[in-house]
């Protein structure tokens, strides 16, 4: 396993990759499991609760996630070729952040509940209901696979301020 560099919005080349649409993978094999292991290690190191493959420069429909609270046993989850098959009309607002937009947090409104289908780490087909933080996180990460960042859900002014804040923080570091 290896920690990979997380692409960020303050770097033009990184942003160009982050805005691309990822592709489905044909099968879950050892190479893909290696990528998922690297992604999980990278996410834990950051630290974060979710990471899409595009955030480490891989344009494949893969997400890793761990919603365990501090002090709880780690509970890593893997989502290959995830799809939302149903979304509630009821909305839920949550203050989101993103490892590709460091130190920026803002409220985003999304469907409160979704049904998802995906392949797991072993390549088995899974269908599952998601609500609350799980629903927010899976939708946030699936947006990445479509080239959409959480700041794209904000007004142009807030989005521009967010990118400026990240650039300013990088210069100060």
UniProtKB/Swiss-Prot annotation:
Its cofactor is Fe(2+). InterPro entries: Peptide_deformylase (IPR023635), Peptide_deformylase_sf (IPR036821). Keywords: Hydrolase, Iron, Metal-binding, Protein biosynthesis. SUPFAM superfamilies: Peptide deformylase. Pfam families: Pep_deformylase. The keyword Transport does not apply. Removes the formyl group from the N-terminal Met of newly synthesized proteins. Requires at least a dipeptide for an efficient rate of reaction. N-terminal L-methionine is a prerequisite for activity but the enzyme has broad specificity at other positions. It catalyses: N-terminal N-formyl-L-methionyl-[peptide] + H2O = N-terminal L-methionyl-[peptide] + formate. Fe cation binds at residues 98, 140, 144. HAMAP family: Pep_deformylase. One of its GO terms (biological process) is co-translational protein modification. Belongs to the polypeptide deformylase family. Binds 1 Fe(2+) ion. The active site is at 141. This is Peptide deformylase. Its EC number is 3.5.1.88. GO terms for molecular function: metal ion binding; peptide deformylase activity. It comes from the Bacteria.
């Amino acid at each position: 396993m290896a920690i990979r560099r997380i692409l960020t919005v303050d770097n033009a080349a990184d942003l160009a990759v982050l805005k691309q649409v990822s592709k489905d993978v044909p099968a879950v094999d050892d190479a893909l499991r290696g990528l998922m292991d690297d992604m999980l290690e990278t996410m834990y190191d950051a630290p974060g609760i979710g990471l899409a493959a595009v955030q480490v420069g891989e344009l494949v429909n893969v997400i890793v996630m761990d919603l365990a609270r501090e002090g709880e046993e780690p509970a890593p989850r893997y989502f290959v070729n995830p799809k939302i098959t149903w979304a509630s009309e009821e909305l839920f607002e949550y203050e989101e952040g993103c490892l590709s937009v460091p130190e920026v947090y803002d409220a985003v409104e999304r469907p409160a509940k979704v049904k998802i289908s995906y392949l797991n780490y072993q390549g088995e087909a899974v269908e599952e209901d998601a609500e609350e933080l799980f629903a927010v996180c899976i939708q946030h990460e699936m947006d990445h696979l479509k080239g959409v960042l959480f700041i794209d859900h904000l007004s142009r002014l807030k989005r521009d301020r967010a990118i400026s804040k990240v650039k300013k923080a990088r210069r100060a570091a």
